[in-house]
């Protein structure tokens, strides 16, 4: 008999994360986690991050924090710099919201947490599993967008 697996897939789309946070908050509040695999695309990776930590506090504040103008500069298109300062945003966000990384490690034990990333050259989807100490680069890669296609 073949074992069936259940996946929770959270899409990206910037502010659609507000809706996704509402769903995952309800799952947390009801201790609902029948999932074997967690797959996040773009902002969905960040939403799953907080779901797997089991953090429901301040999710609106997290979305507003990420939308602040401090981290976004369209003029950087012309200077060759990053349009969105993801590294700085995550660094500042970790100080402000203090995520418990041990919780996420415990909650994915024996399960898969996957980030979907678009290859910048070929525009193909690539799938990256998370392991110890690999959170930041994979989250940032999933969140970054190619501007010109």
Q: How would you name each of these model-derived features?
A:
Residues 1-41, 49-149:
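Patatin-like phospholipase
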